Design a protein with these regions (language model features):
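Core AdoMet radical
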Residues: 13, 31-44, 57-72, 85-103, ...
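A short, N-terminal amphipathic alpha-helix
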Residues: 48-56
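Flexible mid-to-C-terminal extensions adjoining Fe-S/redox cofactors in radical SAM and related proteins
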Residues: 32, 228-250
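Distinct, well-ordered alpha-helical segments
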Residues: 74-81, 99-112, 131-137, 158-164
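Canonical Radical SAM [4Fe-4S] cluster-binding loop centered on the CxxxCxxC motif
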Residues: 1-45
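Short, well-ordered alpha-helix to beta-strand connector turns
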Residues: 11, 26, 86, 117, ...
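Alpha-helix termination/capping residues and helix-transition junctions
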Residues: 23, 55-56, 114, 168-169
């Protein structure tokens, strides 16, 4: 950063890319190329970074992503144990079917760490890109949980209601996501021409909008199930001049 740092109360969200890859090849993933050259990735380096960020912003949020955080439970446990309880912790995962680690082991991990994990976000898309663990397994995750669904390119809009019913059965909230590689400051809040927003408003009850300059959320209800349509910029910093005349990295 070249300017003074400014962020929301509590500090910026810190994203931790776990130092091991996943077995997936989702077409909208922008992280896969980073794991092709992961020589500098290590649990030890991440532990040092966690300590640094805790000192700078002792109440910031941590988000584990990848890669696949649940591909190495021993390493994930070490990283979780290093985060003080002043922070909220989120995990993005496919909760995968994977060799060497059963669904029961992953469920037990969530039970042991239910006091450390704020929410687990499980990827389940309209189009299947990976071998998914059964919905009944997802429902057994011991922490608060949410399903993330990227509505990518020519997604099957006529399946949206069935998808909502699928998760209403377990009362698991749903977050539909725009392809964030296509999000810009100009279209972040642009509603005209937003096909996803139109498809959702056509099928579900629109409840309102919240957000900031970096991201937003359109909220919907379907028979008591809370759903969100989320858009976010593909980068974490914007440069802006404040009312005091000082230029900040935000």
């Amino acid at each position: 950063m070249t300017h003074p740092y400014k962020t929301r109360e509590g500090g910026a969200t810190v994203t931790i890319f776990v130092p091991y890859d996943c077995r997936n090849h989702c077409p909208f993933c922008v992280n896969k190329q980073e794991y092709a050259h992961a020589e500098g990735f290590s649990v030890e380096a991440i532990l040092k970074s966690i300590a640094v960020m805790d000192e700078i912003t002792p109440r910031c949020d941590f988000v584990f992503t990848g890669g696949e955080p649940f591909a190495n439970l021993k390493a994930l446990q070490r990283m979780l144990d290093a985060i003080p309880t002043t922070h909220k912790v989120y995990i993005n995962t496919t909760f995968p079917v994977q060799p060497g680690c059963s669904a029961e082991e992953m469920i037990a991990f969530t039970e042991r760490n239910r006091d450390k994990i704020t929410c687990i976000n499980i990827s389940r898309h309209l189009t299947k890109y990976v071998e998914e663990s059964p919905d009944e397994v997802v429902a057994r995750i011991a922490t608060p949980k949410r399903v993330n669904c990227v509505l990518y390119m020519d997604y099957p809009a006529d399946e949206l209601v069935d998808y909502a019913e699928r998760w209403r059965k377990y009362n698991i909230p749903v977050q539909f996501r725009y392809d964030y590689t296509e999000t810009t400051p100009e279209n972040l809040y642009q509603e005209e021409g937003d096909k996803i927003l139109a498809d959702l408003k056509k099928r579900f009850t629109y409840k309102g909008l919240d957000g900031c300059r970096m991201r937003n959320g359109y909220h919907f209800d379907y028979k008591g199930l809370h759903m969100t349509y989320h858009k976010t910029l593909p980068y974490s910093t914007i440069v802006e001049t404040g009312d005091d005349g000082v230029t900040y990295d935000i």
